[in-house]
Amino acid sequence: MDETIGMKKEFHDISVGDIEVGESAPVTEDDKMLLNLGYKQEFKREFSLLAVFGQSFGSMGLCPSLVGSMAFSMNCGAGGMVWSWFVGATCLLPIAFALSELASSMPTSGSLYFWTAYLSPPKYRAFLSWFLGYVLALAYSTGFASTIYAAAGLVQATASVANPSYAPTKYEEYGIYVALSFACSALIVLPTKFLARFSSFNVVFQICTILIFIISLAASSTSETRNTGSYIFGNFENYSGWTNMGWSFILCFTTPVWVLSGFESCATIVEEAKNASKAAPIAIISSLTVSLFMGFCIMITIAGTMGHDFSSILNTPYGEPVSQVLYNNLGKRGAVGVSAVLIIALCFNCSALCLASSREIFAFARDKGLPGSWIFRKLTPGGIPLNAILLVNLYTIIVGLLMLVNVTAISSIFNLAIIAFFISYSLPLVCRLLFNRLNPGKFYCGKFSKPISIVAVAWLWFMALMLLFPSYQNPNKVEMNWAIVVLGFTVFFCVGYYYLPKYGGKTFFKGPVKTVDENVTEGVTVDFQADHVSKEDDGKSYN
């Protein structure tokens, strides 16, 4: 396949960045592909393959995120912890392959939102891209908020280990949450070149965190805390609020799907990446695969060093089960030291998520999809979408008010983030299957492409439905799953705003809008708005 879709002539007289005619600066294949998709180059391409991988790997923040959400996977004993991770994470691989094909074909920061628009017929394009834009913004923003909440919980647990008399009020907990939100966001207002270096550094730091965690627990375990292989892989007990063991095991999938959600986030920074159509699919698949096996090792380590008193771990006074495991094996100082490293790693994870969220909001605002889009599509002189970053923080602060209700209410944001991500993942794949409009990029699965997408959609819909269920079999209004409330409000606002008479999105939103000047695109086919025929089944090779 040609390096660009629908490209009719080469560009040798276009200046990258300001897109002016008459300059002699070289134009890369990345710039040509972006031009063909209808967008001028606004970001600087500073992200190497390692940095792109670091964005996805860092967004997952494997070890600290797993530690912060461990309680969800402990509903079925040690065996349930270990196997729910392996099964849940493995089932995400078809999704990674399916999304990698789209990322390679359409490397733009709009990612899932743009892909949905591109793959849908003109009749449905505007509404579907509008809907997906809002759900995806909800997914990334809630993913950031839930990770900030996990970080705040880890900070409080560490403080409790260091000082057993420490007992923060819910308002103090909320204050820690807000402070962490701004602190983690501050890191990504720096220039793109720094962000690329930070992303690469984050890979090294996250891997070092994993090694520190595993080695410290394995080396310090005693006969009282060390468990046998039969216990690690074969102990199944029901500690959930449901009587059915099988359903309790399915609920354990919350940990792997939450921790690993965001593995495609590198697609939101492809306009800042070099050789984006290759780098994005490599980063998506490799980051998920590495996280799957490293996470499995972490789970085995925790299950092998937690002892047999599962109830005391679950009901720890520190608030975080893994904090109790660290204390039992390492003592106070060791537990605080390892927890400090986990907190730093989790904050880096939060920064990576905020980066992805702000880029998606910028891309959606660039296409006039948000109220006040002209505000959120602005870049600073350094090329940073500062207003979009502030919007992410505003949402995080508001949704964090659920902390003042109860733990069950705020815990629902974990489910909400996953559900929103899974809806966002599934919609472009459904369009790709129904309308057969994919022009394959450099990464393509050939005859296995459609079967992989079908399996991916089936798993996404199953998990999205499962995560709407409450944590308890007969919940009261306090124990209900609040995810459906926030998701329902978002869908209601999205659809209502779109069809609002005279002022709604239907009157002005047409889907992704090209930002390339006409004098630049002269002689170029930017065929996004035109109907097109898929090249997927023409018998040619696209690798």
UniProtKB/Swiss-Prot annotation:
GO terms for molecular function: amino acid transmembrane transporter activity; gamma-aminobutyric acid transmembrane transporter activity. Glycans are attached at N275, N406, N519. It comes from Schizosaccharomyces pombe (strain 972 / ATCC 24843). Keywords: Amino-acid transport, Glycoprotein, Membrane, Transmembrane, Transmembrane helix, Transport. It holds the Pfam family AA_permease_2. This is Uncharacterized amino-acid permease PB24D3.02c. It is a multi-pass membrane protein. PANTHER family: AMINO-ACID PERMEASE BAT1, GABA-SPECIFIC PERMEASE. InterPro entries: AA/rel_permease1. One of its GO terms (biological process) is gamma-aminobutyric acid transport. The keyword Glycoprotein applies. Its main location: membrane. Belongs to the amino acid-polyamine-organocation (APC) superfamily. It comes from the Eukaryota. The chain crosses the membrane at residues 47-67, 79-99, 126-146, 176-196, 198-218, 249-269, 282-302, 335-355, 384-404, 410-430, 452-472, 480-500. GO terms for cellular component: cytoplasm; membrane. It is found in: Membrane.
